[in-house]
Amino acid sequence: MAERTNLMFHNKVIGGTAIKRLISRLIDHFGMAYTSHILDQVKTLGFRQATATSISLGIDDLLTIPSKGWLVRDAEHQNLILEKQHHYGNVHAVEKLRQSIEIWYATSEYFRQEMNPNFRMTDPFNPVHIMSFSGARGNASQVHQLVGMRGLMSDPQGQMIDLPIQSNLREGLSLTEYIISCYGARKGVVDTAVRTSDAGYLTRRLVEVVQHIVIRRTDCGTIRGISVNTQNEMMPESTWTQTLIGRVLADDIYRGSRCIAVRNQDIGIGLFNQFKTFQTQPISIRTPFTCRNTSWICRLCYGQSPTQGHLVELGEAVGIIAGQSIGEPGTQLTLRTFHTGGVFTGGTAEQVRAPYNGKIKFNEDLVHPTRTRHGHPAFLCYIDLYVSIENGDIIHNVTIPPKSFLLVQNNQYVKSEQVIAEILAGTYTFNFKEKVRKHVYSDLEGEMHWSTNVYHASEFKYSNVHILPKTSHLWILSGKSDRSGSVSFSTRKDQDQLNIHSLSTGERDICNHLASNNKIRHKLFHFNPSEKKERRISDYSIINQIICIDHCHFTHPAIFHDTTDLLAKRRRNRFIIPFQFQSIQERDKALMLASSISIEIPINGLFRRNSIFAYFDDPQYRTQSSGITKYRTIDINYILKKEDFVIEYPGVKEFKTKYQMKVDQFFFIPEEVYILPEFSSIMVRNNSIVEVDTPITVNIRSQVSGLVRLEKKKKKIQLKIFSGNIYFPGEMDKISRHSAMLIPPRTVKKNSKGSKKKMKNWIYAQWITITKKKYFVLVRPVILYEIADRIKLIKFFSQDMLQERDNLELQVINYILSGNGKSIRGISNTSIQLVRTCLVLNWDQDKKVSSIEKGHASFVELSINGLVRYFLKIALVKSHISYIRKRNDPSGSRFILDNESDWTNINPFFSMNSREKVQQSLSQNHGTIHMLLNRNDKCRSLIILSSSNCFQIRSFHDGKYYKEEMNPIQRDPLIPIKNSLGPLGIALQVANLDFYLLITHNQISINKNGQLDKLKETFQVFKYYLIDENERIYKPDISSNILLNPFYLNWHFFHHNSCEKKTFPIISLGQFICENVCIVQMKNAPHLKSGQILTVQMDSVGIRSANPYLATPGTTVHGHYGEILSEGDILVTFIYQKSRSGDITQGLPKVEQVLEVRSIDSISINLEKRVGTWNGRITRILGIPWGFFISAELTIAQSRISLVNQIQKVYRSQGVHIHNRHIEIIVRQITSKVLVSEDGMSNVFLPGELIGLLRAERAGRSLEESICYRVLLLGITKTSLNTQSFISEASFQETARVLSKAALRGRIDWLKGLKENVVLGGMMPVGTGFKRIIYRSKQRQYNKITSETKKRIDMIYQSNLGFKNS
């Protein structure tokens, strides 16, 4: 032992990690015995000091932090601001939840950090401070709950409760806080009990897998190894230090030409430092993966003993050590949650703060605007971003790492300690993520609207589930619905105002028809004439109510006369249109067939190219029976069917197609089909012949006579009855036995005598085989259908629609609804449509409009003189261009506009179903103007819809409008009603509610952007009027502060002395505005509540109250556009990723999933494609046999390494370090089984048998032939039940089954493992028992050698004796 004078004296606090290092160095220098003596002295000293101190804990020792009060008030203030932002629609529910969690978590963490300095300054000898911060008893989390704040709690499902406990246990809890605390404490107790048992069971299974693995040899002679690259910068030093130290080299290591380490040399600290200093080549080491022994491991493949620092001894039970090394930390780490009582734990992002005041500068081209997880605007940098902060002559540079958020703008002035960036969490910390669904419930009863197009969720094709493609607001417009049994038509129109006092003239029902999901909800006002004294309604205190009839637009039935059958009924957004007719007979016929023609509008109002716009089901192509369709020609074109295409998501386009046959004829082969349950009692046999009305089951009778065919399909029985004649063919007939064929009309021989018979119709000959020698041909009747020519189809549709030739093309096409040879099964009492006549929408694909991807369909509703007309508008639109406001542009920051800027209209197409085009002078009738904006500067179109329901498109040439004479015609009030498209509802923005009248022949000047030049000068020549809902006419003065812009149908506000170049807030009718938005630029302007603008008058704006809900892309929307939602209904569902709690109890299930080989994450869609690409490349480089061999080898090795890394990530995230050797032994066992395939190994093993991988390779080498097997990844439970010892299997699980199978198979247990020897009371083959076994085997071998030697001596002696005798 060294002299005391040579020892150094250290006076510092020592932790657990430092004690481990000290003990390791003591063992190296002094050995095991003297080290234990030193540690005993340390232990005795510790107990002596603890006894002398005699610390006791009282309630007065719990000192609360002085700064707690203002910290809690600051957190509450931040949450109040967050709540307002959420109410304004600037932050959605998930962002609000995240920010709320981080606010309270940061406050709680600040308390935790302040505890130690507070105790150190105020009371350094406080018992709580001494015990907890020295590690003697308790930890910082428990003391934090005693003197800080209890904080956020978890509910029984593990989710965070949004209400934090602000009190600590010293102050006492309120009733609400106590209940929330009990939630978390109960969860903590249950989790502790359950997860401790889970960890124990995991340890048992791990030991079960590897209990037989013992060190039995010194060297297995393998030349394989795993390469470790010491120059890998992505791997931290601690990781590959642990990977290399204690291993054995599989190959020599050279530095230049000098060998610095040889094969089979173990790596110590000194050799490892040489590798680190010299930066050598990749190092090949031996691992348990590379050992060639089947049931045990050699010393060199295992490496150094973890306890003694030299090569492991023979007989060491390394398998049990490995199982306990992995399982025991899980058991211990569950104890971490014992006393924290379910307190929620999480992490926050690391922040970068400015060191001093200054102006910040960075390269704007390297960042991209985005939103943080809290909903704040920020910039995302993909690479290292260099940010400089300038303050006079001082320049400070900061490097922002990739994937971080920059929270400030370029050239912005920042203050000292201001947060300028948030850095992503460390790359090597393993955070568990789980997908969480967050439902947002409506807190207002009313009508749903959204301000962007939404997509149908593909898995819910016809439901009310939609998916948002981009960030937008969802609105709930306030309104109440009174469900009543009676429904009556109203004489009022949509959006009309009505006075309650006007209802007192008699009994009258005024209904609010709200159509959604084919249900009608309405508001009912009921007055009884007998109650004349009480002229008030107690339920409705508001004087003026607005009727909202949604998109169905019911009008008074007296107006429609006998054409009310043409009213559209919503049927998955398909709408009925009437025919063209000239006479009463044609009109009556059209009314009968009106239900057959439908216009199909998608939910979001968007058409793709070659979409079906309208279709007509002709009754002559209908059938009541099931059957098969056959085409006469096979010329197939594809046509897009909107019902069948899958919505395109970002980066994914997937379409399904229907067949459209360019055929004149097709065939239908009728048959009777029944699908019966498997247990049905069928009264007919297969291949039997039945007559009409023959009972098939108890409740079913046959409708036709013919041959019965039975077939079983997926637990059901399919019964078909084929009508026709049976024909027994001769040997020379040329009908194929394996197929059926159509035979055209022709003359055939009836019998061998030569008589002939002429077939008039087509027949279908089908070969029926009963047995191998019994067969016949069934001749079935065929129905021939001829498809009408295109010219005959045009009469069904309006000529105006087909004559549009500018950009849009409408084609009339027939297509067959089923494929060639497809069977059609009908439903009882319903007809099957075979051919559909459709109108296909297309547009020119030229260079100018190459970006056009969609057509936007909308309906324009106009009401003139009490008549409602609907016009269909199809506007070609370019793909969505997200508008991002410039960062330095102050406009738009105070006002939220609607989504009109997203659309780029290109020559919209208007069509109207009228008998003839009518022209009428503008001077005689006032007309309603609807302006169309074109991108073509030379031609601008005005569409003028006059009160006589005729329309006319005029053009502006060079920005001027010229007067033309038009011939007036007589008006027929019934024509517009019969020829209107009907009340068609569609999911669109709210239509403009006011009407604009234009009486002018003066010039209108328009600039290039479609705006009005010189607003005041332009409006002086406009003679326009405003009609409000009460039909009062206003004529605004030019000097007023409101102007009408007819090009956008918006309103401009400005003042008398304002500059013309000044930007004005714009109000659109139907526009949504958020709360606290100022729409008038003047002092003391009112701040409005959120809602939708309904009316704009001279001195007031009418706003319907509404609540906005912000939603992000991918959010699921529940409900249709315009649907009525009650308070508390699910509005949207957010799917977001949340970090799990920070203890091992959340990680253990992941470890168990890996070890039991259950899928953790979703499998990549392109996995099969990637594997195929890899195999192709390797085969191309190395050739076919070597390519597949190396691919298989690399797959096995890489899967093993990947499993080891997955398990290590879980434990390293908790600060637990387990040596890779232990995990490698476990993974070696669960990846060492192969499944024998049916090809090749029938001589040695049975197909489907599980054998060891090394055993299969040895069998292949001994047989000198290729062996086919498939490598399996078995879980630890299945591996324990597939060992060489049936005694070990029976003692683990399913004892009776294992022993029964072992007895039937005659299995032999060689008692090589520990467990089977313990069960039978034998000597365990480990430790000292292993030496006895080795001694016995040597003694047995010696006895065998001596016996053989004696035999040979006797034989020699006898032979010599016989030779002498001879």
Swiss-Prot record:
Its main location: plastid. Keywords: Chloroplast, DNA-directed RNA polymerase, Metal-binding, Nucleotidyltransferase, Plastid, Transcription, Transferase, Zinc. It holds the Pfam family RNA_pol_Rpb1_4. It is found in: Plastid, Chloroplast. Binds 1 Zn(2+) ion per subunit. GO terms for biological process: DNA-templated transcription. Zn(2+) binds at residues 220, 291, 298, 301. Signal peptide: none annotated. Its EC number is 2.7.7.6. Its cofactor is Zn(2+). GO terms for cellular component: chloroplast; DNA-directed RNA polymerase complex; mitochondrion. GO terms for molecular function: DNA binding; DNA-directed RNA polymerase activity; zinc ion binding. It is an enzyme of class 2 (transferase). InterPro entries: DNA-dir_RpoC2_beta_pp, RNA_pol_beta''_euk, RNA_pol_Rpb1_3_sf, RNA_pol_Rpb1_4, RNA_pol_Rpb1_5, Rpb1_funnel_sf. It catalyses: RNA(n) + a ribonucleoside 5'-triphosphate = RNA(n+1) + diphosphate. SUPFAM superfamilies: beta and beta-prime subunits of DNA dependent RNA-polymerase (SSF64484). The keyword Transcription applies. NCBIfam families: rpoC2_cyan (TIGR02388). DNA-dependent RNA polymerase catalyzes the transcription of DNA into RNA using the four ribonucleoside triphosphates as substrates. In plastids the minimal PEP RNA polymerase catalytic core is composed of four subunits: alpha, beta, beta', and beta''. When a (nuclear-encoded) sigma factor is associated with the core the holoenzyme is formed, which can initiate transcription. Belongs to the RNA polymerase beta' chain family. RpoC2 subfamily. This is DNA-directed RNA polymerase subunit beta''.
